[in-house]
Amino acid sequence: MQNNYIPNIDLSKLVSNGINSQYSKEIANQIKKASEEIGFFTVTNHGVPLTKIDILLNTCRKFFYLPESEKIKIAPKKWNPHTETVYRGYFPSSVNGKEGLDIGDPQLTHDMKDLISKQTFEVNHDMSYLDPQWQFIINDYFDELHNLGMLIFKTIISVYSPNLSVADTAFQRPKTLSTLRFNFYPKQERPVEISAQDGVALGCETHVDSGIMTILYQDKKGGLQVQNRNTLEWHDVPHNSEAFVINTGLALEYLTNGRMKATNHRVLFNQEERISIPFFFEPSFDFKLDPKYLDIVEESKYGIDCYEDFLTNSLKKFVEYDRPN
C-alpha cells in the first residue's frame, strides 16, 4: 500500500491572506491536482481553532453517552412517531452499526414557512436541555465549517473561472442543504458488511458522497480508506488530529462536468469506540449544477439538475435515509 497517497495541503497562507492573494493560485493548483487525480486530501492550518473541535467532541460524547430512551426523543418519525422531523435528529445503531445525529443549518427557523414547507428542510431539535451551551457550540462550529467550505470552494472555482461570486449564488443560507453529522461508533461486535471486492470486514460500506465536498474530522484513526480509481487499490487516509479530511462529492463532479470526480471510500471494521464528524457542504436547494457557471462550455455529461432533486435521488442508496412515505 502506497505511503502518502493522500496529499496534505497547508492552507495557512490562504487563510491569512485571502482568496485574492498571490498565494491562492499555488494552493488552487494543489487542490485541483488532488481533486482531479484522487478526490481526497487533508488540510492543515485551516483556521478552525482546535479548542473549538475539542469542545465539540466533548459535547458529542455527552449526547451519545445518554440512555437510549433520552436520545430517541429527538429521533425522526421512523423511530419516534411523536416527533415532527423525518430527516433531522438522532438515528440509532440498529441502522448500520453506528449512532448518528444530523443537524441542518441553524439559521433555519420555524417562521421561514416557504422553506420548511419543503420536504428537505427541517428545523433542528432544541437540545439546550442537555447542555445550555449546546446551541452556541453547534452554531459556532457550523459557521466555521461553512466558512472553510466557502474558502475551499472559491479556490476550486478559481481554477476554472474568475467569477468567484458563483459560490455566493450556490450557498445562500439558510437555503443550503448542508448537514453537520455526528457519527458515534460504539464498540462494535460485528462488521456492517464484508467487502465483495477483497473480503475485508467493514464498519461503513463503500460509497461516494453526494454534496460539493465533505469536510471530515475524526477523533482518532478510524480506518478510513480511499479507492484508487485506476488500480482499484485501497489506501489508508492518514490521521492527524490537527487536520480535516476533504473529499469531493458527486455534486462537484456534475458541476465540473466530470473533471473532479467523487471517489469511492469505506471504513474498515474497528472495535474501538470513536467519533467522526463529517460536514456535508451542500448548496442551496434551487442551485443548478450547471458547468457553465464555471465557464465550462461543453455539453453537460450528466444533465442539469437543481440540487434538491439531485440530492433526493442520491440519498436513496443510504440506509439511514430510508424513510417511510
For each predicted feature, which ranges?
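Peripheral, non-catalytic segments flanking oxidoreductase cores
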Residues: 1-325
